[in-house]
Amino acid sequence: MNSLNVKLMNNTPTIVVHPYIKRSRGSKEILLEEAIKLVQAINLNCIYSSLVGIDSINPKTYLKSGYVIFLKQKVIDLSAELIFLNT
């Protein structure tokens, strides 16, 4: 990435999403917080973050359509320019 791209992305309004498998006992909140810190470390502006439970990993339907519609509305409402999907 060249310096022009870095300047253009500086402070970009970003939504951070961390999907997790519902049956897992992992610390999903810690992983979401880590994703937010990563976004901030590369000078993006986290304006919203969310955990989303998934039943299983399926590349065809990773996120359910209802959540995609919800996420689309968040992008519109918050004028987000980037979604960071922490997978």
PLM features: what roles do these ranges have?
Residues 1-87:
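N-terminal accessory targeting/assembly segments
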